[in-house]
Amino acid sequence: MHSPHKIKSGLRIAFLTSFDPSNKKAMSGVSYYFLKILREQFEVVDIIGPAKTRKVLNGRINRLLRFIFKRKRYNLDHSFLMSFLYKFEFEHKLKGKQYDFIFALRASTEIALLNAKIPVVYYSDATFKLLYNYYDWFSGFLKLSVAEGNKIEQLALRNSSVCLFASEWAIKSAVEQYGCDPEATYLLPFPPNVDHIPEIELTDKSRTTGICNLLFLGVEWERKGGQIALDAYYSLKSRGIKCSLTICGCIPPEPIEDEGINVIPYLNKNLEVEYMQFEQMMLNSHFLILPTRAECYGIVFAEASSYAVPSLATQTGGIGSVIKDGINGFRLPLEANGADYADVIETHFSDYAEKYLPLSRSSRKYFEEHISAEAIGKKMVQILENTLSKKQ
């Protein structure tokens, strides 16, 4: 729990962002919750943003570029044009201000050309090279656009005194593909998108009804492996295991008629009533099952761990830095099917006291020690203060 009299670091931080960090929906809530951590740890945290330049993305220039390049895709978001516009806007905003560090979250284009004479801390969960062709929506760009994107990434990393990444997967790319200094590159998980962490007593799953409650939580049915999760549920049922499946965040493409399946198309965590519904759903779950096809990190796995819910996902992207096998869940191969997931669930749930409960409790313990807002905040302060002491 946070102490009301916590002594904060005296470092002065500029939180540079082109988005509005007060908006929980911007950047999937990462900027909102990370700003919260910064304010808990540092005395001075000023927001340098949002940027007017971002409006260009939806304005006349973007429409003009789409007309010029027709169906070929030009990624304006990672372009030198945007980087120059950001440079002038942010240098103007920073003029005459004194800070120990500029904190740039997922802001490679914003800082690539920045000349602020203040050490920059860059924080992300991926590099341009990792993203390109990994996600369907981040593919098929013009060669010029790919070249610009890679150069922007390289300049941003070179322009940073400290590089923080949410996964070892991203660190490897930054160091090996972009020449990032390994001595100034650190692993720092992304914070969970929750306003308060449930008391540990509430997450205790000692009492059981004998029904295994599965949770599929995601907005993209196909990319998140919805059909595999559904197959796992049916596989468990065919084995005579009592179970339920809650599908939250999307609607399956085919209608499902099964009394054990509950579909919640959308929950708005900004609304108190729906947040309480989300919380109850998490507290009632035994496993989060998300056989995702592509994932840079997966904040939802950290959220599940905070509720002592083990996660079952795939070995892809940066998931290995948030799910530790046998500690807070398991990562299965991408080709694993529903029956494979059902095997893992059955093994643990059928031996509830000896296998499931220890996994549930170690999920919460791992969360508190490594991926909670408090653990992330402490590690970040340590990294920045050590960086400053090396320079003095």
What positions do the PLM features span?
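Membrane-proximal helix-turn-helix segments that form the acceptor-binding/catalytic region
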Residues: 142-163
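Carbohydrate-associated surface elements
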Residues: 169, 191
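Conserved donor-binding/catalytic core segment of Leloir-type glycosyltransferases
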Residues: 199-224, 230-235, 245-248
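Nucleotide-activated donor-binding/catalytic signature segment of Leloir-type glycosyltransferases, i.e.
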Residues: 249-287
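Aromatic "clamp/platform" in nucleotide-sugar-dependent glycosyltransferases that forms part
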Residues: 293
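Short hydrophobic beta-strand element within catalytic cores of glycosyltransferases
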Residues: 310-314, 323
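A short, well-ordered alpha-helix in the C-terminal region of glycosyltransferases
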Residues: 354-370, 379
